[in-house]
Amino acid sequence: EAGKTFYKHRKENHVHLLGLKYIPIRSKFIDVGATKKEQIFIMLGGSDTANLSLKLIHSLKDVAIKKLIVSNDSDIVNSLKKYKDVEVLHKPLDIQLVEAMASSTIAISTASMGTYELAYLKIPTIIIAVAKNQEIGVAQFIKYNIASDFISIKNKDWQCDLKSKVQRIFYQESHDINQSINGKGTENIAYEILELIK
């Protein structure tokens, strides 16, 4: 569908590798062997100038599940420490990040590359669009079961909505997560390139 939605003006002499089978997944994700724990992985990315991390954790303060949240901002890290059941990953190394993601039972993430990595790990994910370019892709993430649900921070009740969706997804017995992201995206790209130069 990417061809219809985003690449309407393709040039005939170009080859576009579109679709989930071309999503490259970092080798650290493919090699990870983490044990699942009852925890929520939260990654909003960037500098979080809107303090969304704090609002999000506050909205989940009554959800008795450990929360692992990634933050690069020292001030936000100090504010997050006052909440119980919260572990802050401050500027984590890649391997720490991957292990935290892989060991979680549910995730909250921006609509970004991290969502594809979470889908590869089969982690049900609630996505939040924090930028205009992310809003465009939200419908596709949901339609193709890359993410389990979506929260719009433009909705005045988004915090209650988030709490409700986290509880529903956490206690849901099974999740329909797209199987097309299989870690072979890089191989598929290389194969297509080799076919073109034959």
Report residues per predicted region:
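A nucleotide-sugar donor-handling region in carbohydrate enzymes
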Residues: 1-49
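Conserved catalytic-core segment of nucleotide-activated headgroup transferases in glycan assembly
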Residues: 30, 36-75
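Catalytic binding pocket for nucleotide-activated donors in carbohydrate/polymer assembly enzymes
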Residues: 116-160
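Nucleotide-activated donor-binding/catalytic signature segment of Leloir-type glycosyltransferases, i.e.
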Residues: 77-93
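Short acidic alpha-helix that forms the nucleotide-activated donor recognition element
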Residues: 93-104, 119-120
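C-terminal alpha-helical cap of glycosyltransferases
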Residues: 167, 182-198
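Acidic donor-binding loop of glycosyltransferase active sites
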Residues: 102-113
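A short, well-ordered alpha-helix in the C-terminal region of glycosyltransferases
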Residues: 171-183
